Amino acid sequence: MCIRDRLYDVRGPVVDEAARMEEDGMEILKLNIGNPYPFGFSAPQEVILDMLSNVRTSQGYSDSKGIFSARKAIMQYSQLKKLPNVTMSDIYTGNGVSELINLCMQALLNNGDEILIPSPDYPLWTATATLAGGNVVHYICDEQSDWYPDMDDIRSKITDRTKAIVIINPNNPTGAVYPKEVLEQIVQIAREHELIIFSDEIYDRLVMDGYEHTSIASLAPDLFCVTFSGLSKSHMIAGFRIGWMILSGAKNKAKGYIEGLNMLSSMRLCSNVPAQSIVQTALGGYQSVNEYIQPGGRIYEQRDYIYKALTDIPGITAVKPRAAFYIFPKIDTEKFNIMDDEQFALDFLHEKQVLLVPGKGFNWGQPDHFRVVYLPNVRQLEKATDRLREFLSTYHQR
């Protein structure tokens, strides 16, 4: 498999061009990546102090799955989320969720095996599955239904080579939160076809508007599920690189796969130990993220601002996100003659020095969407949307 053929446009060609422009002295307004710290967010003070106090005792390797205190705290968190049949040995820490997704795909997929991944998706899923030799089959999430998965589309794409289904809930890039009824339908499909369920839940503590997050594994005690989460987003420490995955449910149906996971986990020795040392404090302490996602909080108010500002621009529509810090607007391709969304993003970057990610970067099949990160403060978001309005007032792709 040729690595250069794999798309990962969150850090792709448009981002490369922005970096070149910065080297030439231009100031770029970046709305392309969910990295909280550069936008003025920081970890709770007790988390920082806890890491500093543990550095001296964190200089050696840990168990390949992680230190006891971290896994114990994660197990307790899994109990709060009602994940069934979880023991300490079912918990793996990683250098972010990204490392663990890659590990899972390497252990699962042989050449020609198929895996169902949403469209739009977080592109790491498609890239790692393809690099592992699998065939990615994208199922549609329906914008007209609040970006929920299209069950008929899922069913139509299952074959005898389908091994698993991936869900991203809360969703990146759409900000959707799947209700229990939607998750139950996915569980039923997985049950009928004996599919493994992979659930990416890194934004489960960033849910707004009274919505509740349900872990799909809690609805599937008879199925083998792998649930991913971590501290990068909820605790604003993406650079610390600490995530985890939890195996639950019918582990007896996946003994060979679990052996493969254990082998690959041992091969990378362990995840970084200083970051593991803060998990207990982070999960058990004051959850400062709650201040951000309530009315008056930064993420909540910035979400409201970006939604209104974008949908006030002629030719732009959007579904209001309910979680995370992304919005995935639709652009009228006929109005602006857009045939290539990457070219649209490059044109906007060149003319207005604002960096967005085109929809193709999330394996969306039409050139009619782009993702905006609403982590910048309202003043910066206002600047970005004013520039977009000005740009689109005369734009006609050539």
Model regions and ranges:
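Helix C-cap/helix->beta junction micro-motif
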Residues: 24, 132, 192-193, 223, ...
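Conserved glycine-rich beta-strand-loop-beta hairpin in the small C-terminal domain of fold type I
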Residues: 280, 296-307, 318-332, 366
